[in-house]
Design a protein with these regions (language model features):
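Short, acidic, small-residue-rich periplasmic hinge/interaction motif at the N-terminus
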Residues: 26-31, 37-44, 72-76, 86-131, ...
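Short acidic/polar hinge/loop motifs at secondary-structure boundaries
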Residues: 58-61, 161, 179-206, 294
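Flexible loop and strand-edge segments within Gram-negative outer membrane beta-barrel domains
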Residues: 272-293, 299-366, 372-390
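Membrane-embedded beta-barrel scaffold of Gram-negative outer-membrane proteins
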Residues: 365-379, 478, 486, 523-577, ...
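Gram-negative outer-membrane beta-barrel transporters
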Residues: 446, 550-558, 577-661
Length: 741
């Protein structure tokens, strides 16, 4: 098989030596031309560099002391070009057939990347990083990075919830290829509906995000990029099994019809049929579950004319059975014989994306996105019922260009969203329709050398939230080489879907109280907050093999209005609007160490101070560890001539004590004990096509004692399975294999 590398570099705008350089990098495989995504492009002996995007294009600021450009990518020989004129049209064709086996790997793309060049504080997690843990789905994809905290939501569903900057996932904008995904009805379980093997990369942005992505992000944005048919391998198979009775199958099948059209079919299935009660309380530690997940993607790419488009559809069916070990839904539903629950969810998604880059003006482009989703959940918890159906439509139009030169960029666009909710709680209906039309403008001064900034604003017209203005600002300053200071500020707001976001309340017998009737959504007013952030990053080397990055950030989220979820009364859960103050302060310090790209150590300390004015007074948010410590050690052996390799990973989590609400019998008005968790995985790569892995989670077997309050009387007023501060199941061993053809 012959591969050729094409490099076309074009300077943009006026003929001045300081003007940035733009270009496109492509490769040819069997006479077919494809964009080379993720290629490193940098000026020799400098830190000024970038990577190519999904179209293979890049834009790079000029270096003051060199005109030597280096382009590198794994599997291709590193190329060096002399850029001698301000306007250049260069094409290089190189036959690499006889040199591929002799390439010396001097630098590989890191699976965990914190950029010093980007203005915003964004962490990129690649699919290689996700292989370090049992990433069966998106909710389990954050165990090996310190930016996101992962916790179980209750003692029954086995569902994991993520938190960032001390606040739960509803305050995050969780998107899929920049289309809002986990929101509304899918907030509780939506992260479990994206299989881990489908994920190409995850971008985690802290603080106020871009106005182009909407107004709902308050603490940040998590965006998932899925595998692309044109770059994914033709066939992939993953088999997974664990001692907790979970079995999983993942297959990817991709086909390229010609230079323009590609398609991929992705199948995921998981099943847990075994029942476990390791703590002997008569309740299942993990639900009996069954899920099927299908996706088909079509991709059209025409680099010569500047077009790229995606058409995707997905179908998912998920069922969970939880509750008492001997619960039989056919006999016991609606009765007080045994407590049980069934959660059935069906979801369908369809999306279309179209992008155009002007061939003669590569810095100018427009994009169009539209998506439809149908989410239907039928469920009951003991004697309580909860059903929700959400029909959503979203569309986005965006135009990118420059003002004068490519240092001054802007984007402008329109968003429209529509959500129709049909919701029933114990027979009471809470139906509503949300519609929003918004416009945005964002300006970027993109000077990678010393100072860059992004300022954006948007205006939205929402039928339930009103008309409102959203400003956001990001600053980046480089006082000395490889030392970056970032500042950010911005506002956000959202409608609180109080039942969908807090489905753990149905795992209790608490009385539900909504203590407001003034707002348009459940009688409550929308949530509004400002987020402010400061970040510091410094990279340096200790000799050529040792590379270290020190980073710290401090964020404050200040709510001007919030829907308070009050668990303080042992037999009630109350929802009401904030009267007083609610502030979340988050501090993180991280050390990231690399040795010759084969050994990586990440260490982080996090501190949270989240204070809320409840009706009973100002208190720290319950079930939130004020102090957390994280460490991850990864090692990879050198790849042999036949592709064999060992990979090993060890992760440590220390979770500090957490404030408990008043109905904890063992710790009345107190705090939970602190604890530690250890996870590890060993992978043996036999060739480029086949590998096996063996891992363990919570190998110290730490468990919360008596996780269900009032378990002896599940229909009594004291029953509460929502007060969870630690794992329930204990240790878990898993194994699997991956086949790539």
């Amino acid at each position: 098989m012959k591969k050729y590398l094409f490099i076309v570099c074009l300077s943009c705008g006026m003929v001045f030596s300081q003007d940035p350089l733009s270009g496109v990098i492509q490769y040819q495989d069997n006479n077919k031309t494809y964009p080379l995504i993720g290629a490193s492009v940098f000026w020799k002996n400098t830190t000024i560099g970038t990577v190519t995007d999904i179209e293979g294009t890049f834009r790079l600021e000029r270096a003051p002391d060199t005109d030597i450009l280096i382009i590198s990518y794994i599997g291709f020989k590193t190329d060096t070009l002399k850029i001698s004129t301000p306007f250049i049209s260069h094409q290089m064709i190189q036959n690499l057939q006889d040199e591929l086996d002799e390439v010396t790997l001097t630098q590989r793309r890191r699976a965990y990347q914190k950029s010093l060049i980007q203005t915003q504080n964004i962490l990129k997690v690649s699919s290689e990083e996700l292989l370090k843990a049992a990433c069966c789905n998106l909710s389990e994809s954050f165990e090996t990075n310190p930016a996101v905290d992962v916790n179980f939501t209750d003692a029954l569903t086995g569902t994991k919830q993520i938190k960032m900057l001390g606040l739960s996932s509803p305050y995050l904008l969780i998107s899929e290829e920049n289309i809002p995904m986990v929101r509304g009805a899918s907030q509780a379980y939506g992260l479990t509906f994206t299989p881990g093997t489908w994920v190409e990369s995850i971008q985690i942005g802290k603080g106020a995000g871009s106005v182009a992505n909407g107004f709902e992000s308050i603490t940040g944005q998590i965006n998932t990029e899925l595998k692309k048919p044109i770059t994914d391998i033709p066939f992939f198979l993953n088999l997974f099994a664990s001692v907790n009775g979970r079995y999983e199958l993942n297959t990817h099948s991709n086909h390229k019809f010609n230079n323009y059209w590609s398609t991929g079919v992705y199948v995921h299935g998981n099943k847990r049929s075994q029942k476990f009660d390791n703590n002997n309380d008569g309740f299942l530690d993990l639900p009996v579950s069954d899920q099927i997940n299908l996706m088909n993607r079509w991709q059209y790419t025409n680099l010569e004319k500047g077009w790229v488009s995606f058409l995707s559809w997905r179908y998912m069916n998920d069922e969970k059975l939880l509750g008492a070990l001997s619960y039989d839904p056919k006999k016991d539903r609606g009765m007080k014989n045994r407590w049980g629950s069934i959660i059935k969810t069906k979801r369908m998604d369809a999306s279309f994306k179209l992008g155009y880059v002007f061939p003669e003006i590569p810095y100018q482009s427009f994009g169009f996105q539209t998506a439809y989703s149908s989410h239907d959940q039928d469920s009951y918890y003991g004697l309580r019922t909860y059903d929700i159906n959400q029909q959503s439509f979203y569309t986005n139009l965006i135009f990118n260009s420059i003002i004068g030169n490519t240092l001054n960029k802007f984007k402008v666009g329109l968003n429209y969203s529509f959500d129709d909710y049909v919701e029933q709680v114990n027979g009471y209906s809470f139906n509503r329709m949300d519609q929003n039309m918004g416009g945005f403008f964002e300006f970027t001064y993109d000077n990678n050398d010393n100072f860059s900034w992004i300022a954006g604003f948007r205006m939205d017209f929402h039928n339930n939230l009103g008309t409102f203005f959203t400003p956001r600002l990001h600053l980046r300053y480089v006082p000395i080489e490889k030392f970056v200071i970032r500042l950010s500020a911005g506002s956000g707001r959202k409608a609180a879907n109080i039942f969908a976001e807090n489905q753990t309340l149905f795992a209790t017998n608490r009385i539900i109280k909504i203590q407001s009737k003034q707002g348009k959504i459940y009688g409550l007013n929308p949530e509004k907050a400002w987020n402010y952030g400061l970040g510091l990053s410094k990279s340096f080397s200790i000799g050529s093999p040792h590379q270290i990055t020190l980073s710290s950030d401090f964020y404050i989220t200040d709510f001007t209005n919030q829907v308070i979820v009050d668990w303080e009364h042992p037999h009630e859960i109350s929802f009401y609007n904030l009267k007083g103050q609610s502030t979340a302060k988050s501090f993180q310090f991280e050390v990231d160490y690399y040795y010759r790209n084969f050994l990586n150590l990440k260490v982080a300390y996090k501190n949270y101070n989240v204070q809320i004015d409840y009706k009973s007074g100002l208190m720290q948010k319950p079930l939130l560890a004020k102090n957390r410590f994280f460490a991850n050690l990864s090692w990879e052996s050198k790849i042999t001539s036949v592709g064999k390799q060992w990979r090993w990973d060890l992760t440590y989590h220390y979770v500090g004590s957490q404030r408990l609400v008043n109905n904890f019998i063992d710790h009345p008005k107190g705090f939970s004990p602190s604890y530690s968790l250890w996870n590890t995985q060993l992978t043996r790569v036999f060739s480029k096509k086949f590998e096996i892995y063996l891992g363990g989670e919570n190998i110290g077997n730490y468990r919360q004692i008596d996780p269900i309050i009032g378990v002896e009387d599940p229909f009594g007023a004291d029953f509460d399975a929502a007060q969870i501060y630690a794992p329930i199941f204990g240790g878990m061993i898993y194994s699997g294999l991956r086949l790539k053809i």
